[in-house]
Structures are given as structure tokens and as C-alpha cells.
Amino acid sequence: MEETRRRFVISSVLSVSLIYLCLSTCHVSAFDFGRRQLRFNTDGRFKILQVSDMHYGFGKETQCSDVSPAEFPYCSDLNTTSFLQRTIASEKPDLIVFSGDNVYGLCETSDVAKSMDMAFAPAIESGIPWVAILGNHDQESDMTRETMMKYIMKLPNSLSQVNPPDAWLYQIDGFGNYNLQIEGPFGSPLFFKSILNLYLLDGGSYTKLDGFGYKYDWVKTSQQNWYEHTSKWLEMEHKRWPFPQNSTAPGLVYLHIPMPEFALFNKSTEMTGVRQESTCSPPINSGFFTKLVERGEVKGVFSGHDHVNDFCAELHGINLCYAGGAGYHGYGQVGWARRVRVVEAQLEKTMYGRWGAVDTIKTWKRLDDKNHSLIDTQLLWTKNTTLEPNFGFSCSTIPQH
């Protein structure tokens, strides 16, 4: 009798899972079939490696910027490659995010496709899924942003998208706006649910509007509308049968150029990491941060662009974090090691001993120094606690980027 009951329960769970899978695929485009589904590991963890501002050029022929005189004769793009290989081997991430200025197209490379191949090679060779968005320097060549994203999308292990399948509904600006859904691990009742949502956005390069001069671009209304619609749909899916959840799954945003809110923090505010230059953000605040606060889903926004800033600071429940510059061809600071940012989400255990929803999100940085130092471990968010907000302001002179 007990064995019959056990088989019935197992059969019911499998049937529910299969029905949910069939229902879920109604919202999946043909583009998504055949692509690797991201999910938490059986240890309840999911780790993301963020690499920003490689500014990759010709490989060994490209000289380094802002290194010591002793290092300069032997330093090239290959130092960036070595750093990434070293970090991938140490951290073993589940996903690698290249957050813009991956190559330096401005009169620096005659073959931008070859530069991208070299820049992304450590991720490709690792076999680990990876994605990329563009910065303001990537397309400064004979290749458009759209063409670059189409090229990146087709590289091995890449989960990048040119734009979401429903982009036409929003007449979405830019190229490289997409969502990644991280589902529960094998054996979890949340196996078919997205329990961590990633939003990657194209923050553009330079505005083309009259009256602004040569200023940085911003996240447009069309992109914000797409984010809001996607976020609401994911919330509905998260709370629907089977195994409906009471809360919204946490989200993370990656974009290259920092939002104006990053400038609200200076050295005197409570932050983890350092500010060593001004925030170079758009001249227009398009309201994207307000949209994120209103939705209440996103727990962290991760940017690059300002190479020698690497801090995280919290504002209205959202952590604003710099990656720090990873590339040796891009500007840096002598004696200040190139670096990358790691984010790790950890699941909670249910009362039945199964993996449940995301419990904590933490971050740290890896340096390309002698010891491959791990620094500034920080809890960004925990499910049961609201962190105190920080406020600040900086209005120092903006340097050239």
C-alpha cells in the first residue's frame, strides 16, 4: 500500500512537471529551442563572472596602458587573455558576462571580428555559457552594433541575443537587449521556474540628439517598456501553478554605461570598493532607475565604463556596482591591478530538504595580481532582510573616456 502511494506521488509530480513544461514553451520563441538552459547547480549555487572594458585590440601586438615601466615592454592584450583564463579556472563560473567595451574599434583594429574572437576566446575555450553587451567603443569600426551582436550571437557557447523576439512590439532601441532566466536545479520543485532573472541592456554609445554635443547615450523609453513587460510576465509565471511562489524572483541588470544614480556616491559614503574617478553617465536621466525601484524586483545593477571605480553601494534597495577594468589596453592606474567582479546566488532549503528560492546574493572581486587576490566579499541581498540605504553625491570633473 505504501509503495503504491509512493509511486502515485512520483507519477503525479512528473505529470505536473510535464504539463508545466508544455505550458511554458508557449512563451518560448523558436530562437530559444536548442540553446542551453541556465539553471542552478545541485549545490544550490549559481555564479556569474562579469568582465568589463577589455578594450581588446590586436593581441600580442597591442601595447598596454597604465602599467609600470618594468611591465610595459612585455605587456599586451595577451595579459588580458591570461587574466581571464586564470580567473575562469579559479572561479569556475556558471555564466560569463562581458559588459561592454570588449574591443576597441576606434582606429585600433582593422579586423574587428578577429579582435572579438581573441577577446572572447577564454570563454569559448572554457565551454562555459557566456553573453555580451556592447559599450561605447565596441562599434567604432566598420561594423555596426547590430552586425556585432549578430556575430557575437553565433559564436560557440554564446547565449547572447541581438534583441528579444518581441522587440518589434516595442520598437526597441539598440541592439543587445535580452533576458536570461536561471531555473531551479535538478530535483528541485522549481526545476521549471525561473528563480533568478538577468536583464542585459544596450545603453548605447553617444547621443545623436541636437543640443547635447558629444555625450553618452541612455536607456530609452522603449527599452524600459520592454523591461517592465518582461518583468511582469516573469512575476506572473513565478506565482502561477504549479508550485506557485509568494514573492517575486530577484533580478540583476547588466549595462555598460552607468546610470546617473551611480554619481550619488562619493568617498565619504558607505560603499564597498573605491571611487577613483567621476561617474561618466548620460546627461539625461531617463528614469530607468525609478522604473527598477517601482518594480521592486532588481537587486543589483552592474556596469563598467569607469575603469578605476570598483565600488558597490546601495540606493533604495538596489545595489549599484562597478566591475572595474579588466583589460590591459584600456586605461587604468599604475599599481592598481586589473579586476573582474563575481556574483553568486545561493538557494534556500525548503522544509522538505529540497532547494527552494534564492536566499542570498553576494559579490566579490578577483584581481590580476601575484596572488590572484579575492577582495571585498559583500552581501548584496538576502531574502529575509532589507539592507539600510546609502546616499551620497559627487560632482567632480568628468575625465575623458
From Swiss-Prot:
It comes from the Eukaryota. Keywords: Glycoprotein, Iron, Metal-binding, Secreted, Signal, Zinc. Substrate binds at residues 197, 305-307. Residues 1-30 form the signal peptide. One of its GO terms (cellular component) is plasmodesma. Fe cation binds at residue 307. Its cofactor is Fe cation; Zn(2+). Binds 1 Fe cation per subunit. Glycans are attached at residues 79, 246, 266, 371, 384. Pfam families: Metallophos (PF00149). One of its GO terms (molecular function) is acid phosphatase activity. InterPro entries: Calcineurin-like_PHP_ApaH (IPR004843), Metallo-depent_PP-like (IPR029052), PAP14/16/28/29 (IPR011230). Specifically expressed in flowers. It is found in: Secreted. Belongs to the metallophosphoesterase superfamily. Purple acid phosphatase family. Homodimer. This is Probable inactive purple acid phosphatase 14. It comes from Arabidopsis thaliana. The gene is PAP14.
